[in-house]
């Protein structure tokens, strides 16, 4: 929980996304932190780990 920016259909950042995290887009962020996250990678058509840099 709390790993991703909420999808557009969630009205508040305080709401929790309860769906499959692998269907969320890979959002790497613009900062330089290095957090491991998971999301759907259309290039490989599967859920994959990626590095999230923080900040939106």
From Swiss-Prot:
Alphabetical UniProt keywords: Disulfide bond, Protease inhibitor, Serine protease inhibitor
SMART domains tied to this protein: KU
Domain of life: Eukaryota
GO molecular function, one term: serine-type endopeptidase inhibitor activity
PROSITE patterns per UniProt: BPTI_KUNITZ_2
SUPFAM superfamilies: BPTI-like (SSF57362)
Ranges of residues in domain BPTI/Kunitz inhibitor: 22-56
Cysteine pairings via disulfide bonds: 31-55
Site note Reactive bond for trypsin, residues: 32-33
Function comment: Inhibits trypsin.
Protein's recorded name: Hemolymph trypsin inhibitor A
Origin species: Manduca sexta
């Amino acid at each position: 929980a709390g790993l991703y920016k909420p999808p557009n259909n969630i009205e508040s950042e305080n709401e929790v996304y309860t769906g499959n995290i692998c269907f969320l887009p890979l959002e790497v962020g613009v900062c330089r932190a290095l957090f491991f996250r998971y999301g759907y990678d259309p290039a490989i058509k599967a859920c994959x780990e990626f590095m999230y840099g923080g900040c939106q």
